[in-house]
């Protein structure tokens, strides 16, 4: 039996979400249609509202409803410090630590040549323009510690250092509350290499 075309279209749309395969998308679609049509309508309205009202901040590239986001508009922030992150979700995580008082630049991805993601796709030119505006003194690279994140940090670091900026990278090591017995060898090795005096 063939699915109705409207249901097939819904399943395909749900598959666009990260980590959602055909079976999960089908389960979600059937759940929404069988048990939560009101929730489905709310989801549809919310998606439409977000696509119509969210844009990229002109300065840092994160999502905002205004031309300039709240963080970039905050005069209490230190404009000489710029933290580079891969996604708005990474920016939110750093904000939750309440340890960063500088500004941000959100790449909206990371370098991944095999996936066709190069400097243009991560807004490299905008980052360089922002970092070399004469105000920024230090750039903190807070990309993830994946192969792509490391490659992105290396590429950005080399380019920004060649323009006279101080470039630092987030430290790595044993997590707070972590026991050495349960931490992988690579993390312990990096923590040992990045040790500091007390």
From Swiss-Prot:
A zinc finger (C4-type) spans 57-72. SMART domains: TOPRIM. It holds the Pfam family RecR_ZnF. One of its GO terms (molecular function) is zinc ion binding. Keywords: DNA damage, DNA recombination, DNA repair, Metal-binding, Zinc, Zinc-finger. Coiled coil: none annotated. One of its GO terms (biological process) is DNA recombination. InterPro entries: DNA_Rcmb_RecR, Rcmb_RecR, Rcmb_RecR_Znf, TOPRIM_dom, TOPRIM_RecR. Residues 80-175 form the Toprim domain. It comes from the Bacteria. HAMAP family: RecR. Belongs to the RecR family. May play a role in DNA repair. It seems to be involved in an RecBC-independent recombinational process of DNA repair. It may act with RecF and RecO. This is Recombination protein RecR. The lineage of its organism: Bacteria, Pseudomonadati, Pseudomonadota, Betaproteobacteria, Burkholderiales.
């Amino acid at each position: 039996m063939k699915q109705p075309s409207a249901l097939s279209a819904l399943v395909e749309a749900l598959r666009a979400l990260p980590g959602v395969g055909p079976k999960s998308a089908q389960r979600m679609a059937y759940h929404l249609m069988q048990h939560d049509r009101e929730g489905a309508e709310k989801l549809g309205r919310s998606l439409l509202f977000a696509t119509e009202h969210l844009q990229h901040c002109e300065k840092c590239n994160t999502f905002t409803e205004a031309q300039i986001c709240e963080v970039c508009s905050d005069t209490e922030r230190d404009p000489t410090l710029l933290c580079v992150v891969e996604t708005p979700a990474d920016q939110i995580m750093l904000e939750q630590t309440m340890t960063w008082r500088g500004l941000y630049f959100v790449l909206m991805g990371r370098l991944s040549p095999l996936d066709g993601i190069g400097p243009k796709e991560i807004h490299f030119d905008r980052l360089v323009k922002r970092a070399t505006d004469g105000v920024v003194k230090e750039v903190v690279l807070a990309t993830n510690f994946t192969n792509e994140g490391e490659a992105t940090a290396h590429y950005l670091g080399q380019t920004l250092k060649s323009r006279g900026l101080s470039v630092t990278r987030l430290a790595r090591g044993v997590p707070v509350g972590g026991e050495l017995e349960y931490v992988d060898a690579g993390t312990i090795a990096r923590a040992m290499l990045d040790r500091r005096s007390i």
